[in-house]
Amino acid sequence: MGKNLIDLYTDYLISSFSQTTATGLSTLVDGCLSHDQITTFLAESDLDSKSLWLHVKPMVRELEKAKGTGVLIFDDSIAVKPYSDENEIVCYHWDHSKKHYIKGINFLNCLFEKDGISLPVSAEIIEKDECFIDPKTGKEKRRSSITKNQLMQKMLTVTQNNRVLYDYVLADSWFSSADNMKFIKKDLHKEFVFTLKSNRLAALSFEDKLEGKFVPIDSLPLNEDSLISVYIKGLDFPVSLVKQFFTNKDDSEGVLYLACSDSSSDYSQITAIYQKRWSVEEFHKSLKQNASLEKSPTHVKKTQQNHFFASIYAFVKLECLKIKNSMNHFAIKTRLYINALKASMKELHTMSEALA
């Protein structure tokens, strides 16, 4: 029942265009499953990062056979839950893109991308499991006993132990700490491409590093389409630094500083590899808009966790449908919506004819 029910539940998450509830699913299957059976499934299942890996492992092994560069992409996001009661996983988190705190479920994911296919191989919910008194306000607040950088390293270790075949780790500046760089290069013997903030300090030579002659990277003589080798403060190995220009939505010009640990890669290769990171933005968007991540009204931590991972399972199902039907997730969702409208119109016409 459990395996069949997770398959049915993920179908429901993909098919739904409103709140996803136990009552709604029970009604959809004409009562073949009761409300209590569905709530019991959500309350007693143990969906987590380990079960996610077992679910996607056969697909990952097939994808590893494809030609091209395989990458692991790390990023976090927040599933907004403004009306849910606060607990260890539903709490206030700083949203660095919106520059303010948001109430919801913060999660960190590891996405394996190769040949245009994206598969989540690890995901963790950020738990603020410690309460403390803010000395400035005197109010009780929550914090996590483990940092996101520590969690990232833990997830990388698990992924390495699972023998996922990848070439680079990609992440934005929020995860580009020197500790993460050293861990990937020295402990895992892998390469990385990270963005850096413009005020990150670097030395132009090993001698400058030893003498403490570090300068902000935005002051370095770096042109587009070129790279220089630098020593980021805190590292004992050089990285290739490139400066990439891009156009924002408001037509203003932006700059990305990319640091790559692979000294054999040139500007074009580094920027092409980092371009793969944007698939994680599509992952987050599809989770929220196509897999009903934010549409469950559950109030209990356990059911919230299980719904979260079920939404990721639903994303994987959409990715498989994308491959089979040559349609992106939003095109698939649109087709479902149009067919639902057609069925609704047909039913309405039948009802109208009965009145004639």
Positions of the model-derived regions?
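Gly/serine-rich nucleotide phosphate-binding loop at the start of the catalytic core
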Residues: 1-51
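Single, function-defining residue in the core of a domain
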Residues: 2, 11, 16, 85, ...
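Short N-terminal helix-initiation segments at or just after the protein's N-terminus
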Residues: 8-20, 50-57, 106-112, 198-203, ...
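Generic hydrophobic, aliphatic-rich segments that mediate packing or membrane embedding
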Residues: 21, 55-56, 68-72, 106, ...
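Active-site-proximal, Lys/Arg-enriched surface segment
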Residues: 12, 43-122
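Hydrophobic, Leu/Ile/Phe/Ala-enriched alpha-helical segments that form helix-helix packing faces
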Residues: 29, 60-64, 156-163
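Glycine/proline-rich, flexible active-site/cofactor-binding loop segments
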Residues: 20, 26, 33, 111-117, ...
